[in-house]
Amino acid sequence: MDKRNYGIDLLRLLLMFMVCILHTLGQGGVLNNAIVGTTSYKIHWFTEIISYCAVDSFALISGYMISKNKLKYKKIINMWFQVFFYSFIISFIIKIININIPIGKNELISYMFPILNNIFWYMSAYFGLFIIIPILNPYLLKVKKDTAKKYFVSLFIIFSLLAYTKDPFKTTTGYSMIWLVILYCLGALANKIELFKQKKTSTLLIMYFISSITTWFIYMCFNNDKLISYISPLILLNGMILVIIFSRLKLNGKIISKLSPLALGIYLFQLNSIIWNIYLKDRFIFILNYNIFIEIALVFLFATLIFISGLVVEYIRIKLFELVKIEKLSDKIVECLSKIINKLSLLLN
């Protein structure tokens, strides 16, 4: 059994808090309404940039923590039920509580099929990645270190360094399954080659802030936001640095290990279509009416409130799922699908 890394568990929670910051600034309307050139504009965009690598880091973790254990397909079925809960059940409950919410029958029906309808882009992309992980893992686990270094450099150059300006491989600036696959491979290869092993944590932190400041400086001075992208080499570098730093931490993880699995639910909670488009949309513009120190405090305060709200809702969901025995249903679905796939595979003989 693979030993649990509590540093990575802690990172998952930090990354989700960073995502909450991104959504407070972005969907909350702070960035779009800050006056260009003001201190508020500069500070909030810097906060955005240092948090932007969170999504990349999540996918990198999946590869970095690559396991020799057999993939459990029940995990993806459980995840589908989780996504269904946040897409349809939460929307249905909100509609019942507030009948004036502008949501039609067709929209509710689309929420019943969240993966097919790409309700949560990351989850649709992750489902695709999950399906091909069994194909990727045998090679990623066995590849020799020298070969892994060559592939790591090649993937970084082709899909990030060269691609972020023109995106010839249709990664849609990172909002796609193909980018998650690349990140998964990069994470696994980084672990194999022991990336930055010789560098001190302090050095990595300096690299992180230099990368962030460079991205921020280019945007502020040249109004060029090309580097503020999931496929940007500097954002990717930041994501990798965080994974490496936190993987080094030696922690007693009793509390962390209980909270870490709740992180995905926090993301799904705030990305629920109604919450995203009605309750978060431009809700935090008023922050800009205060002095910069209060503005910063309010950004972190509202990000914390979103984080805690999602944490509580996810905890309730887990208890509800335990009550209705979703785990057993997932087992039966996996068993049924396995039989169907086995029978279909016989047709290929």
Where do the protein language model's features map onto the residues?
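Structural signal for the C-terminal ends of transmembrane alpha-helices
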Residues: 64-71, 135-143, 164-165, 186-196, ...
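Aromatic-anchored segments of alpha-helical transmembrane domains
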Residues: 17-24, 86-93, 109, 153-167, ...
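Loop-centered beta-sheet repeat module
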Residues: 147-194
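Solvent-exposed interhelical
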Residues: 131-157, 189-207
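Interfacial loop-to-helix transition and helix-capping segments at the boundaries
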Residues: 42-55, 110-125, 164-183, 216-240, ...
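Alpha-helical transmembrane segments of multi-pass integral membrane proteins
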Residues: 96, 220-325, 342-345
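Juxtamembrane "helix-exit" motif on the non-cytosolic side of transmembrane helices
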Residues: 29-33, 96-103, 162-170, 216-225, ...
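Transmembrane alpha-helical segments and their boundary/interface "anchor" motifs
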Residues: 15, 40-41, 45-62, 66-120, ...
